Structure formats: C-alpha cells, structure tokens
C-alpha cells in the first residue's frame, strides 16, 4: 500500500489563485505512481508487490553472464531463452546504464544490434523487439539482474483499494493549515515466471 500526507497553510488555500487541491492531487498521483513502478520492478513481496527483478517470485533467470560486463552473446542468449510464444509480445526492460552498453555492441559482422527507429512514434529496438527503461531496473553491475525480456501481460496487478484523496480540515486546524491524505492499496506478481527471463551479471570473484 502507498500512503502520502501533506499540508498547506489555510490562508493560502483560501486565497488561492490556482486550484491548489487539484495540483496536490496530481502530485500525489505522480508520487504514488513512482512508488508503484519501483515496487513492480524490485519489490520483495513483504507488504508490497513482488517485483519482476526480485530473485524470489520474480522472473526466471534466462542467462548468467560469463564476465562482469554484457556481450552480444548474452543478449542473443537471453532472447532465445524465452520460449517462442512469449517472444511475439516480448519487450526488453533495462536501465539507462545497460542501454548505453548495448548501444555499443556489434554482431559478428560488425553491425550494431541496436536498431534506431526510422518512423516517428515507433520505439528503437533491440533484435527487432521494443524496449523500455526505468531507473528502478538494477544498474549494470556485477551480481545484478540487469535486463528482462518477456511478455508482461503475465504480471498481474490487483487494486485492493482504489486511489483515494481526502482533505483533512480538522487535523491541522490548530496550526492554521489544511491537510491532505492520499492512499492506494495494490499488489502485483508475475503469475507465470517462464513468461519473462532475466540477464544476470556474474558476481565479482565468481
């Protein structure tokens, strides 16, 4: 569950020249969405969703690198570690640090495996499949699960309680403020672990 609380001076609230309640509601929504993104990727399942990259209950390991960096073979092996039926809708998930490394990789013919979009509105691709980035995907470093490839329709999200936004008039009355409380209860878990595979970087010293 996610819970956020804030307050504003009551005189500012009364003399507002713009809709401060609407602004706070949007800001709460943005922050709650950010926390949900984090949990859906790396949550440990203890009072929060089980993230795709969590070692327990998350995606299956498709490939473990032979070194502490990423290679063309690692990316190709990850692609084919995912069964063909799931590859039809598969998307890559990675951090910007991994994107940077992959953009430098070439195949055996010296061609970059990164495929820049040639049409407006279409994403760049890796091995002909689109990718998405998030700051919550683990960075490219030894011992991390740094990249996922799969069909994320098998990651189920349950809204246990719809998002609520309340104005608390009494709670901060003695301080001349107006309070706001936003909350939402959600859960998430990959129900079919074989639908998403990860690339794990070899731990240092192993």
Per-segment meaning from a language model:
Residues 1-9, 13:
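Single conserved hydrophobic/aromatic residue that forms the stacking wall/gate
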């Amino acid at each position: 569950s996610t819970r956020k609380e804030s307050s504003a001076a009551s005189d500012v609230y009364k003399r507002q020249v713009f809709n401060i309640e609407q602004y706070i509601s949007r800001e709460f929504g943005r922050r709650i969405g950010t926390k949900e993104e984090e949990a859906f990727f790396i949550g440990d399942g203890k009072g929060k969703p089980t993230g795709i990259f969590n070692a327990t209950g998350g995606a299956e390991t498709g490939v473990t690198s032979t070194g502490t960096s990423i290679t063309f073979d690692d990316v190709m092996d990850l692609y084919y570690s995912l069964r063909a039926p799931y590859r039809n809708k598969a998307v890559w998930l990675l951090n910007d640090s991994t994107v940077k490394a992959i953009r430098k990789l070439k195949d055996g013919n010296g061609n970059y495996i990164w495929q820049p979009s040639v049409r407006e509105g279409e994403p760049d691709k890796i091995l002909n499949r689109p990718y998405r980035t998030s700051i919550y995907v683990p960075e490219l470093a030894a011992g991390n699960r740094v990249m996922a490839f799969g069909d994320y329709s098998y990651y189920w999200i349950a809204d246990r309680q719809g998002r609520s936004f309340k104005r608390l008039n009494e709670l901060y009355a003695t301080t001349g403020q107006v309070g706001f409380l936003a909350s939402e209860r959600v859960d998430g878990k990959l129900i079919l672990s074989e639908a998403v595979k990860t690339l794990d970087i070899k731990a240092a010293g192993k």
